[in-house]
Structure formats: C-alpha cells, structure tokens
Amino acid sequence: MKKILISLFLIISVIGLSESDRETGITAERTEATATQTETSTESGTDDGGETVENPEQQKTTAGFYEYRPQILIQLDEQMKGAGRGSIGQLNAKYEQELNAYLEMYSYDSDRIFYLANEYMLLNNYNRANKIFLKDNKDIKNVFGAATTYRFMGQNENAIQKYTQAISMNPNFAESYLGRGLANRNLDNYDSAVNDLQIYISKTGAHDGYVALADVYFKMGKNKEAYGIASQGLAKYRDSKILRTLANNIYKNKID
C-alpha cells in the first residue's frame, strides 16, 4: 500500500466562486482556495486525482511552498517578467525547449509534471500550469489539473472535455463532477450543471456542492429549488455564511 498526500489546492480550487468564474448570480461572497493537504492511500490501483508526494529535501520558495522548477526555468520566468513584446516570444520558445529537455530527462514522469504544474498554480500562472499539465494525458491528476486550469482561464469548453476525460478514467473521483458542473454553469448549460452537481453532492455531501447547486438553480429562476438546496446545506453546515447569504437573498427574491 502506497501512502500519498493529496494536494487539495487543485481540489479546493474547483469550487465555484473563484478565479475566472463569472459572478452573475446572487453570491457576493467567495470561497478562498488554500493549499492544504490530507493523507490517503491508493489501494487496488485506484487513482484519486491531484495526488502529490512531499519531498522534505526540496527547497522552499519565499512564498513558503516547495520549489520544483530547475534553475534555468526560474531564470527564464524572471526574465519574462520584465521582457518587452519583442523578446517575449523568443523567451517563451527557450522556455519550452528547456522544459521539454527537463521532462525528457525524467521520461515525462507524471508526478514530476504534477509537482511542476501545481507550483505554477500556486504562483497563479494558470496558463503555464495548463501547458505543463497537458504534457501528460494518462494520469488523472494531470488531466484534472488541465481541466481546472482551463476553467480558471475561462476556456470552459476545453475544461468540460478534460473533466469528462477524468470522469471516464475514474468515475469515483467526485471533484471532476464539481469542476464540470461549474464549467457548464459558466456556459449557461444549466441542466448539465445541475446533473453534475447533484452527482457531486450525492458522492460527497460537501459544502461547495450545495453552494454551487443553489446558485445554479437561482440563475435558472428556480427559486424554490434554490432555497431548498441552500436550506439542506445549512442544516448540515450551520455556520456557513455563504449558504446563509444565499438562502436570505433567494428568500428576498420570493420563492415561487
């Protein structure tokens, strides 16, 4: 039995009201994505998605998380920060060359791809993280990471494709349904969003599922259903300010 740590940055990041998601509904409060970790195990070959293994020998960045970029990529990142339009293309090409050389040295190891891409997520560089996650199309944690970064960048159709791929790889990894539901919500595909979020709630009973589903129902004009879901969530999460705000705002808009 292999003990692993799941990086909850990716998992928590998929909750609805963050980053590039459109805030057109009644939710004024955002849930913050924090980089925390929890321990689990992978028996019987099941991949949980978003897995990572801490390396205590890795140096930490000034931001307090582990540094997985080789020195050449760190240098290129710094150069690109102040680069003009004339040189940015050349620097990007150099970066891609060095990135591929680095990953080839480790035979495109899926864990190494995840460590590196996840670091760019922590640096809020979703475009770079996405390109690195896409280097691996076989490990669910990287497929899920690609889906989530697509969603954060507002590329919801691409996100849906990748979340669907992750679901086909492991239907029991509930966060893929949440992510796909939110991407569908962003595209106003409300019926599909409801279906995905109901599956997510049935699998996890998680707070963010109730928030997202109530918000979708409200956007559909189904105030009664929205209030019912928010109330169910409040019965389970009595201290939730966002669910209470949702319920109050739905009630003010009248329940048909």
Please describe what each predicted stretch is.
Residues 115, 145, 179-182, 212, ...:
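Canonical tetratricopeptide repeat
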Residues 17-111:
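N-terminal leader/linker segments that initiate helical-solenoid repeat arrays
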Residues 122, 152-153, 186-187, 219-220, ...:
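Register position in tetratricopeptide repeats
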Residues 111, 141, 145, 175, ...:
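Start-of-helix register in tetratricopeptide repeats
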Residues 107, 137, 171, 204-205, ...:
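Short coil turns that delineate tetratricopeptide repeat
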